[in-house]
């Protein structure tokens, strides 16, 4: 009884000890005109974007928790929300609104829309063996042909999640039937062995 109590007290003491600040979480460099910033760098605020310098050199990446929050809301299907948004919006049932959850199709459409926004578009088809000189001619001629095809693709509805789950159910039923057939076969063999 004493050993678990001592171990848990020791773990709590170790957890509550102050640790040196992590260098990865500290600001990238000293603030111009401040000498104390170089000695005691300030930790980054994860939910706020870093301040933009006077002369933008490169687009800076957003803080880690902000990006993780975006991924969380993306998985929920709410692209319009951000981690900095209030936790209980007016449309949520907990807040008293009459909001409803997105359907699986809408959530999937949101996910794929955000995914396509992040992916770079390919410049040519992978199966075309065109060289650099031929690519310019193909782009000039192929742009007219690709436009109706792109419009046609955009008009087609996305694959329904109902279809996906229907196919999954069918595969599971087939696996279950095969498992029952194997079980019946092994039971027959067992009965033949015992019956002899």
From Swiss-Prot:
Domain of life of the organism encoding this protein: Eukaryota
Tissues expressing the protein: Produced by the hypothalamus.
Gene from which the chain derives: CRH
UniProt organism field: Canis lupus familiaris
Family: Belongs to the sauvagine/corticotropin-releasing factor/urotensin I family.
Subunit structure: Interacts (via C-terminus) with CRFR1 (via N-terminal extracellular domain).
Modified residues (Isoleucine amide): 194
Descriptive protein name: Corticoliberin
Listed GO MF terms: corticotropin-releasing hormone activity
Signal sequence, start to end: 1-24
InterPro entries: Corticotropin-releasing_fac_CS, CRF, Urocortin_CRF
Keywords carried by this UniProt record: Amidation, Cleavage on pair of basic residues, Hormone, Secreted, Signal
Cell compartment(s), UniProt: Secreted
């Amino acid at each position: 009884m004493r050993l678990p109590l001592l171990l848990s007290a020791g773990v709590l003491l170790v957890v509550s000890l102050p640790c040196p600040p992590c260098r990865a979480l500290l600001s990238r460099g000293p603030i111009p005109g401040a000498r104390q910033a170089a000695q005691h760098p300030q930790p980054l605020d994860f939910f706020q974007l870093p301040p933009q310098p006077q002369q933008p050199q490169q687009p800076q990446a957003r803080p880690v928790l902000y990006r993780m929050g975006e991924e969380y809301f993306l998985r929920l299907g709410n692209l319009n929300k951000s981690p900095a948004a209030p936790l209980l919006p007016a449309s949520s049932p907990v807040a008293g609104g009459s909001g409803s959850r997105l359907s699986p199709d809408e959530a999937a459409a949101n996910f794929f829309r955000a995914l396509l926004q992040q992916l770079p578009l390919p410049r040519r088809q992978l199966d075309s063996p065109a060289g650099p000189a031929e690519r310019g001619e193909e782009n000039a001629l192929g742009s007219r042909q690709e436009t109706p095809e792109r419009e046609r693709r955009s008009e087609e509805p996305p694959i329904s999640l109902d279809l996906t789950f229907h196919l999954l159910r069918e595969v599971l039923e087939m696996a279950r039937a095969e498992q029952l057939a194997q079980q019946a076969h092994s039971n027959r063999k067992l009965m033949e062995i015992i019956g002899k």
